[in-house]
Curated annotation (Swiss-Prot):
InterPro entries in the record: 4Fe4S_Fe-S-bd, 4Fe4S_Fe_S_CS, PSI_iron-sulfur_center, PSI_PsaC
Chief place of localization: plastid
The 4Fe-4S ferredoxin-type domain, residue ranges: 2-31, 39-68
Transmembrane segments: none
Cofactor binding mode and count: Binds 2 [4Fe-4S] clusters. Cluster 2 is most probably the spectroscopically characterized electron acceptor FA and cluster 1 is most probably FB.
UniProt gene name: psaC
Function: Apoprotein for the two 4Fe-4S centers FA and FB of photosystem I (PSI); essential for photochemical activity. FB is the terminal electron acceptor of PSI, donating electrons to ferredoxin. The C-terminus interacts with PsaA/B/D and helps assemble the protein into the PSI complex. Required for binding of PsaD and PsaE to PSI. PSI is a plastocyanin/cytochrome c6-ferredoxin oxidoreductase, converting photonic excitation into a charge separation, which transfers an electron from the donor P700 chlorophyll pair to the spectroscopically characterized acceptors A0, A1, FX, FA and FB in turn.
Cofactor needs: [4Fe-4S] cluster
Keywords in alphabetical order: 4Fe-4S, Chloroplast, Electron transport, Iron, Iron-sulfur, Membrane, Metal-binding, Oxidoreductase, Photosynthesis, Photosystem I, Plastid, Repeat, Thylakoid, Transport
Binding residue positions for [4Fe-4S] cluster 2: 21, 48, 51, 54
Gene Ontology terms: cellular component: chloroplast thylakoid membrane; photosystem I
Name the UniProt record assigns to this protein: Photosystem I iron-sulfur center
Membrane topology: Peripheral membrane protein
Organism, as annotated: Gracilaria tenuistipitata var. liui (Red alga)
Amino acid sequence: MAHSVKVYDTCIGCTQCVRACPCDVLEMVPWDGCKAGQIASAPRTEDCIGCKRCETACPTDFLSVRVYLGAETTRSMGLAY
C-alpha cells in the first residue's frame, strides 16, 4: 500500500504517535522548534498500514501527524468514485 505520513511543525514532541503506531513507522528526532526538543519523523512510510492510530493519539488541536491513504485503499473503502 502506498500511504504517506506527514508530520507538521505543530508537533509538541509528546511521543504519543510513536507509541501508538503498531508498525514502527514513526520515530522521534531532535528539533529546536518545541519545548520538548524533538519532533516525530516518519522514515519508514512503506511500512504504514493506514490504521491512523497515530492521528487518533495526537493531542494537538491541529493533528500534527496525518496519514494520507493511497488510492487503492481509498477505493476499497468506497470513498472514491
